[in-house]
Design a protein with these regions (language model features):
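C-terminal segment of N-terminal export signals and the immediately downstream linker at the start
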Residues: 1, 23-49
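Basic side chains
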Residues: 4-5, 9-10, 205, 278
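Short non-domain terminal segments
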Residues: 5, 12, 31-34, 56, ...
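N-terminal export signals
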Residues: 6-29
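Glycan-processing catalytic domains of CAZymes
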Residues: 41-296
């Protein structure tokens, strides 16, 4: 029986969710791919007209439903090299930790009982992003309390310390550190969502001199390991527009982009929902990313 894990391996997606963005980040210029050892220059031109190129990817090292990778730096560098060769210029660490598992030795989180990581993945990702001229976005910490309580305000306190220590120890030292990713996934009427995203987004910008701060979109109803649409989570286009207009109104001054997940709706509804997403993003001066991560 083929599992989602097998599928990811066979398609060489490296366990990452793909972010499609027309102008995600220009970067400092195209790298000379002929300089990559053992890597042929690839033609990344789209085979279909008027399509968006895949220019960014999540680094989903600490995940909810996928076992953690056990790669070392050799394997990760090969991954970065291949990603850069096909035109990906932006990598987003989807979260810096989940519950007790963390990607870097955070003094604050270790003091709260988190496990000491065997390797400083954050430092490694930033070094590789520097080497391959890629932009890196840091995903905030997920304590798991939101998933337990439905109240996103729980995530503010730990991230106050995480944001400060990450900027001091990593962000201010690596040229590839391009911004922050608010990793919380929300659905409509999520308790504390607007205040939490605004508080975390503002702190990210304040400490880093205004670096970009994108955030994730709605929790998806089509799960990555299945094909069933959760009918209880269904929402109309009009309702979607009203809810996200309220959210964007409350966060647009500190959040630069929103990456809507594509798995909440059926295929024949994509155009209508995507049109609303783009209209709202334009209204509030935000970027609208397409987070095609469901593999459904």
């Amino acid at each position: 029986m083929n599992t989602r894990r097998d599928f990811l391996k066979k398609t060489a997606l490296f366990g990452a969710s793909m972010v499609t963005a027309p102008s995600l980040m220009a970067g400092d210029g195209e790298a000379d791919l002929s300089l990559f050892s053992g890597q042929e220059r690839l033609n990344t031109a789209s085979t279909v007209e008027n399509t968006l190129r895949i220019s960014g990817t999540f680094l989903d090292e600490i995940s909810h439903d996928i076992p953690h990778q056990n790669w070392g730096e050799k394997e990760w560098e090969q991954d970065f090299r291949h990603m850069r060769a096909i035109g990906i210029d932006t990598v987003i660490m989807i979260r810096s930790g989940y519950r007790k598992f963390i990607t870097y030795p955070s003094m604050h989180l270790l003091g709260k009982g988190c496990y000491y990581p065997s390797i400083d993945l954050l430092d490694m990702f930033l070094r590789l992003a520097d080497k391959y001229s890629m932009k890196f976005y840091f995903g905030l910490y997920d304590s798991g309390r939101y998933w337990d309580t439905g109240d996103l305000s729980w995530e503010i306190e730990d991230n106050k310390y995480v944001i400060d220590e990450v900027w001091q120890n990593y962000g201010s030292k690596y040229k590839s550190f391009g911004g922050w990713y608010i990793s919380g996934e929300i659905s409509r009427a999520t308790k504390g969502a607007i205040d939490a995203f605004h508080a975390m987004g503002k702190q990210c910008k304040d400490v880093s001199g205004g670096l970009p701060t994108p955030r994730g979109g709605r929790k998806k109803a089509v799960m990555a390991n299945g094909s069933s649409l959760t009918k209880a989570d269904a929402v109309s286009v009009d309702e979607h527009e009203r809810e996200w207009n309220e959210i964007f109104d409350g966060i647009h001054d500190v959040v630069d982009a929103c990456a809507f997940q594509d798995g909440h709706i059926d295929y024949d509804e994509l155009d209508a929902f995507f049109a609303v997403n783009k209209k709202l993003a334009d209204k509030y001066g935000m970027q609208c990313w397409t987070n095609a991560d469901s593999f459904d």
